[in-house]
Curated annotation (Swiss-Prot):
Ca(2+) 5 binds at E72, E76. The gene is F9. This is Coagulation factor IX. InterPro entries: Coagulation_fac-like_Gla_dom (IPR017857), EGF-like_Ca-bd_dom (IPR001881), EGF-like_dom (IPR000742), EGF-type_Asp/Asn_hydroxyl_site (IPR000152), EGF_Ca-bd_CS (IPR018097), GLA-like_dom_SF (IPR035972), GLA_domain (IPR000294), Pept_S1A_FX (IPR012224). The record marks R192, A193, R227, V228 as: Cleavage. The modification 4-carboxyglutamate is found at E53, E54, E61, E63, E66, E67, E72, E73, E76, E79, E82, E86. The modification (3R)-3-hydroxyaspartate is found at D110.
């Protein structure tokens, strides 16, 4: 203190120097050591909530919970655009996946005002609610369905058609595709049947080769069975695949156009040595029509197992080769023929349509205008009980128990068709029956599914 008083008295400037020296000698460390500095700069590990990925809870609460934040402010917290985007979708309008909307094991991805379901193989739809396998509703395919190696549905179409943009429907790829009615004046009310794909396993559905006999019958020789009673007049062009078979004197059977050069009919319609003329585009047999096309048959091929001397109606199917190709148009169009499995599937839809110029009542006159009739499929047990004659596995019954409606004499060889989404497929050949339209009796048809491979092999166009 004595020194300080003396200095202050003699030189005030020295006071300043003394104070500065005192301060410099004091412990006032400006920088922290490494350990303490690390504690201050330490950032807590991000917490994974399971819903918002990793985030710094404190910063997120401050930035986006206490106050409304922008996307960029949230981006500063996450320091990652992908994680920020996922958080942002929930932050803006809540978690759309909270209610677990995706079914059948589908994974939900949240979005703004929406969500997206990532479906397991075999399922599709907004919520993976649709079983897309072929065993359920035919995989939603309009014609044919198969599974690929990943168990996914692949739809396909019959010849003359291609898949539409939806990859489910089929659209014509040629001017006059098989099984389509293209005459413009025929109204939609004449669409003849509904497609009903049931929840059945359609894969590997071919039937066993079983003979269902009531009685061993060597030769069912009953010409009166050569099989539309109770039908309706068809409009011109409504059944453009239907043909009329003419002998040297009169018409005697029907048939269906397979392609420009071939017709399919019943084998029992073929008579050795009888010249056959096929008339396509026919409607009214009592007058010439501009839509008619006549072709001579140059070759008749019954199915190789057909033997009329043993049984006139077993394997009752034959092919007719024409001398000149038919000119396809709206009145002359082939019928579609699916593969074996699908032909059998279509038959099981339950209803088909038969057509022809046969007798309009039992032992009555033949029709001049093409007739058609909707007939229900009859289960095999009922069919067997209805007759004493043999019903083989390559036959089926269709018709009405109460009678009054049936195919009849002159209709033999004509088509039994099933309409599938506006396209008709051949499912049977009119073969035989006991009388016509009798109560408790049914029409018997050749089951085309048993012969499709043979038909396609023999009728290939070269």
């Amino acid at each position: 203190m004595w020194c300080l008083n003396m200095i202050m008295a003699e030189s005030p400037g020295l006071v300043t120097i003394c104070l500065l020296g005192y301060l410099l000698s004091a412990e006032c460390t400006v920088f922290l050591d490494r350990e303490n500095a690390t504690k201050i700069l330490h950032r807590p590990k991000r917490y994974n909530s399971g819903k918002l990925e990793e985030f710094v809870r404190g910063n997120l609460e401050r930035e986006c919970k206490e106050e409304k934040c922008s996307f960029e402010e949230a981006r500063e917290v996450f320091e990652n655009t992908e994680k920020t985007t996922e958080f942002w979708k929930q932050y803006v309008d809540g978690d759309q996946c909270e209610s677990n909307p995706c079914l059948n094991g589908g994974m939900c991805k949240d979005d703004i005002n929406s969500y997206e379901c990532w479906c397991q193989a075999g399922f599709e739809g907004t919520n993976c609610e649709l079983d897309a396998t072929c065993s359920i509703k035919n995989g939603r395919c309009k014609q044919f369905c198969k599974r690929d190696t990943d168990n996914k549905v692949v739809c396909s179409c019959t010849d003359g058609y291609r898949l539409a943009e939806d990859q489910k429907s089929c659209e014509p790829a040629v001017p006059f595709p098989c099984g389509r009615v293209s005459v413009s004046h025929i109204s939609k009310k004449l669409t003849r049947a509904e497609t009903i794909f049931s929840n059945t396993n359609y894969e590997n559905s071919s039937e066993a080769e079983i003979i269902w006999d009531n009685v061993t019958q060597s030769n069912q020789s009953f010409d009166e069975f050569s099989r539309v009673v109770g039908g309706e007049d068809a409009e011109r062009g409504q059944f453009p695949w239907q043909v009329l078979l003419h002998g040297e004197i009169a018409a005697f059977c029907g048939g269906s156009i397979v392609n420009e050069k071939w017709v399919v009919t019943a084998a029992h319609c073929i008579k050795p040595g009888v010249k056959i003329t096929v008339v396509a585009g026919e409607h009214n047999t009592e007058k010439p029509e501009p839509t008619e096309q006549k072709r001579n048959v140059i070759r008749a091929i019954p199915y190789h197992s057909y033997n009329a001397s043993i049984n006139k109606y077993s394997h009752d199917i034959a092919l007719l080769e024409l001398d000149e190709p038919l000119e396809l148009n709206s009145y002359v169009t082939p019928i579609c023929i699916a593969d074996r499995d699908y032909t059998n599937i279509f038959l099981k839809f339950g209803y088909g349509y038969v057509s022809g110029w046969g007798k309009v009542f039992n032992r009555g006159r033949s029709a001049s205008i093409l007739q058609y009739l909707k007939v229900p499929l009859v289960d095999r047990a009922t069919c067997l009980r209805s007759t004493k004659f043999s019903i083989y596995s390559h036959m089926f019954c269709a018709g009405y128990h109460e009678g009054g409606k049936d195919s009849c004499q002159g209709d033999s060889g004509g088509p039994h068709v099933t309409e599938v989404e506006g396209t008709s497929f051949l499912t049977g050949i009119i073969s035989w029956g006991e009388e016509c339209a009798m109560k408790g009796k049914y029409g018997i048809y050749t089951k085309v599914s048993r012969y499709v491979n043979w038909i396609k092999e023999k009728t290939k166009l070269t």
